[in-house]
Amino acid sequence: MKTLVVALGGNALLQRGEALTAENQYRNIASAVPALARLARSYRLAIVHGNGPQVGLLALQNLAWKEVEPYPLDVLVAESQGMIGYMLAQSLSAQPQMPHVTTVLTRIEVSPDDPAFLQPEKFIGPVYQPEEQEALEATYGWQMKRDGKYLRRVVASPQPRKILDSEAIELLLKEGHVVICSGGGGVPVTEDGAGSEAVIDKDLAAALLAEQINADGLVILTDADAVYENWGTPQQRAIRHATPDELAPFAKADGSMGPKVTAVSGYVRSRGKPAWIGALSRIEETLAGEAGTCISL
């Protein structure tokens, strides 16, 4: 049986602008898990998920309690792994004919000298109106940036260098478990074991995981059903197949597609195996080449 790493887009957990309630997340997860359950019957499946809204909520709750010093961001990322991993595991385990589902708290090494620490640009937390920027920055000391028509907090997002728990993940996969891991891009730690005040991009973490466990494929699921040429124009066209070199211009694109293209291209170049970008609702069609974008050499 082949091994597949699947990175879930944020819409699998929470729709943009939705309240960060457990009820909303369970409802979105319930829509996502049937397709994942079908995949789990055909592949050894490792599932990576984002945590941007959730870790931002934890940070807000953390700041609201004035009696103790706020917990660092790496601890909050670990908390979000437990929260989201539990919700996904509960929902997946309820599907018929599911193998055992296991959530692994995953640490990922980053460099303390990564230039990302000097230029935070990873969005976390809920969306705000632009007119709230000055008050939020003054109250919390946050850095804020535009995310579409909204405003969101940004934090450092260093490059993942090594998944410290990959051997355990690989062992569980070989034993037939569906493994939820590297949640929120993994808990960022430095070589000396210290936690790091950052959030790693989950797509880059998924690509690194696929490399380290020698997966047979990497799937990055997103709101868009493919990578598009001339996006947002009357001439837009879905790209069904491309090489990493052909997709290189898209890696520099603004928005969320750039890191996804960077992630899949790096994996394909490193391992020579295929990767896909597509919509969760069409994941089986994407793997069959009937939807999404397939990236290969």
From Swiss-Prot:
Domain of life assignment: Bacteria
Cell location: Cytoplasm
Gene Ontology CC annotations of this record: cytosol
Pathway entry: Nitrogen metabolism; (S)-allantoin degradation
Gene Ontology molecular function terms on file: ATP binding; carbamate kinase activity
A GO BP annotation: arginine deiminase pathway
Pfam annotation, one family: AA_kinase
Enzyme class: transferase
EC number: 2.7.2.2
Record's signal peptide: none
Keywords from the UniProt entry: ATP-binding, Cytoplasm, Kinase, Nucleotide-binding, Transferase
Keyword set includes Cytoplasm: yes
UniProt catalytic activity: hydrogencarbonate + NH4(+) + ATP = carbamoyl phosphate + ADP + H2O + H(+); carbamate + ATP = carbamoyl phosphate + ADP; hydrogencarbonate + NH4(+) = carbamate + H2O + H(+)
Family membership: Belongs to the carbamate kinase family.
Alphabetical list of PANTHER family matching this protein: CARBAMATE KINASE, CARBAMATE KINASE-RELATED
Function: Kinase involved in the anaerobic nitrogen utilization via the assimilation of allantoin. Catalyzes the transfer of a phosphate group from carbamoyl phosphate to ADP to produce ATP and leave carbamate, which spontaneously hydrolyzes to ammonia and hydrogencarbonate.
Protein name in the entry: Carbamate kinase
Species: Escherichia coli O6:H1 (strain CFT073 / ATCC 700928 / UPEC)
GN (gene name): allK
